Amino acid sequence: MLQLVLAAPRSGSGKTTAACALLVALTARGLTPCAFKSGPDYIDPMFHRAVLGVESHNLDLFFSAPQTARALYARHAAGHGAAVVEGAMGYYDGLGGVTDTASAWQLADTLDLPALLVVRPKGASLTLAAELRGLTAFRTPHHIAGILLNDCTQGLCALLKPMLEKETGLPVVGCLPPLPEAAIESRHLGLKTAAEIDDLQHKIQLLSDAAQQTIDWPLLHTLFDRPAPAAVPCTLPPPRVRLAVARDAAFCFTYAETLEALRENGAELCFFSPLADTALPDNIGGLYLPGGYPELYAARLAANAPLRTAVKSAVQGGLPTVAECGGFLYLGRTLQDADGTPHPMAGVLPGQGFKVGRLVRFGYARLTARADSMLFRAGETLPVHEFHHWDSTENGDAFTAAKANGRQWACGFANAHLYAGFPHLYWAGTSLPKRFAAAAEHYIKETS
């Protein structure tokens, strides 16, 4: 089974486009690949899903213990002929920007997988070799097994390949040529989502077609084939309660592992669109409003008054509810759009969402509960992350969030039927899904 971590010396090297090109090319070669993403990123897995038509999974060593990450990898790699784990940021960049904790390198080390390094050679030649030698000397073992030159012509690849192999001892498996027509646009939270790019499949197909011609596939298999990991089968229990889960262009930031954890605890997930649907799904015991881009769709969300009213009535009536980041903004009184115009939202919470124009609170943190609530017990601490350019006039004070550098702030609303706040939660391997499902079951019994 071909297995690799696709990493890079730094962000902006083209890891996501390279991953998608490899995934489509591997599919064309009959290997039925699966995809993973190192770290908390929501958007890159959307590209993997758009390319493959199957779930892509996050593997994050800040959120998860090593054994949990290994189990998730083994479970979702089972039955596939190839697995591509896309790294985040630079290869060794981890928690706080000054450690290798939760880095792509640490994930490669935890999973015992070789890494394929995506390198853009523009503006350097022999210096690339010096940089690569530094990367291989920085940690032992470094796990780097090969180099893929990105945005590199075949002529330049032919020139650089023998020099790089001689100077670094690392094989060059080929290149991905410059393809301006396959460029993928970005926005304030990174790349645009896969659903927003009409010609995504065409762009990825161009990259895949190029990869078929410019990558040494026998060499790739020699370097990265290894026995498939042993997986423990997961059997889902019969559903005991229905949960409404928002899913559309405005609310698209969900972890596949979170949804799986809910199903493993007896939840049937009923997806709905706050943009298009005028009512919540029937017979639900809970509501999950994930993050996304509600600020870009504020006018449309406001125009759907029946759904806003239904959500307000349900939450105020005690429906167990989880609202993360964008979902939290939706529960507020108003939300500014990208132009700064405020629009009415559900009005469950007192805050008004407004545009800041820069990252407000960014990165990993640890969230500690100040009191018992639906999801948390007083004093419990859970790893979370934040990533947003909008803020609220009322962020709540049910929790204390703390970063590794010592910075702390109060945040979040919580009670016996609610969690709402900017911090994104990762549910796999925690008590959260069990508690949410139990609260939903209790609600159904009490209201039946």
Task: Please tell me what each predicted stretch does.
Residues 239-316:
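Phosphate-binding active sites in nucleotide-utilizing proteins
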Residues 5, 84-86, 116-118, 148, ...:
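Structural motif
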Residues 37-38, 172-180, 268-276:
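Beta-strand->loop->alpha-helix junctions that form or flank phosphate-binding loops
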Residues 108, 214, 237-239, 251-264, ...:
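C-terminal and late-domain segments of enzyme folds
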Residues 2-111, 119-143, 151, 155-158:
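ATP-dependent carboxylate-amine ligase catalytic core
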